[in-house]
A protein has these predicted regions:
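Cation-handling catalytic/transport regions enriched in His/Asp/Glu
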Residues: 1-233
Length: 233
């Protein structure tokens, strides 16, 4: 955890000292719950405070590289929420989905780029790039496919009435096949994978924002690399 903390803080501070200062408060003032304990739900998210209270970060840290990326992602949310509470009114501090996911994915990109610059082993760099490409595919193409499944599910419900698990699985496989286009073999067990995605019940219509955020961050970071210091207010 201490290593993950250092990785995130070094990257955020290197990008902008003010970002590093705010991120440090999340660690120093215990605004993050990271231990995996009995009865704790899985996943990760950031939660708004109010004008008078700070945001919180919820995650389950097990020491993997993906957990570090998740921490960087949620810290992006956390900083966005903190600054919104500081600069905006109570009625304007809550951001739309697309803007929220842009902030979090940008936080991931900051940490990834910082690690890439510090890594001298070409094979490790290649492994990191491969993982990043895989992550980008999941964030853009897969989330769009999931969004199309969700749209198809609601459309079918309106037109056909109550849907069976078999019908939902059929819609799931159809939209997944549109994405993979025969590049992978999808076994029968994969038909049920729609059932583990909590967004369909907990945050309907959400997942397209991940794809939007990823694409906008790629454009924004490219602009940052071209303009450097003038990019940062």
């Amino acid at each position: 955890w201490d290593e993950a903390k250092k990785i995130v803080l070094d990257a955020y501070t290197g990008f902008n000292p003010r970002m590093g200062e705010i991120a440090s408060r999340f660690f120093d003032e215990n605004w993050i719950h990271a231990p995996v304990i009995q009865g704790k739900q899985g996943g990760a998210y950031a939660s708004y405070g109010t004008k008078k209270s700070h945001p919180w970060i919820f995650t389950n840290y097990t020491g993997t590289a993906n957990d570090v990326a998740t921490l960087a992602h949620e810290m992006g949310h956390g900083l966005h929420m903190f600054l919104a509470g500081e600069k905006q009114t109570l009625f304007s501090m809550y951001t739309p989905l697309t803007t929220a996911e842009t902030a979090s994915v940008f936080g991931e990109m900051i940490v990834f780029q910082d690690l890439m610059k510090k890594e001298s082993d070409k094979e490790v760099q290649l492994a990191m790039l491969t993982e990043k490409i895989d992550s980008t595919f999941a964030t853009v193409f897969r989330q769009i496919a999931i969004n199309r499944f969700e749209d198809a599910m609601h459309t079918a419900r309106r037109e056909e009435g109550e849907l069976t698990t078999e019908r939902l699985s059929e819609l799931w496989m159809s939209t997944q096949k549109d994405m993979f286009q025969g590049s992978v073999t999808m076994r029968d067990e994969y038909k049920q994978w729609w059932s583990y995605i909590w967004h369909f019940l907990g945050a309907p219509g959400y997942v397209y924002a991940y794809a939007f955020g990823e694409l906008l961050v790629l454009a924004l970071y490219n602009l940052y690399e071209q303009t450097c210091d003038s990019f940062i207010p």
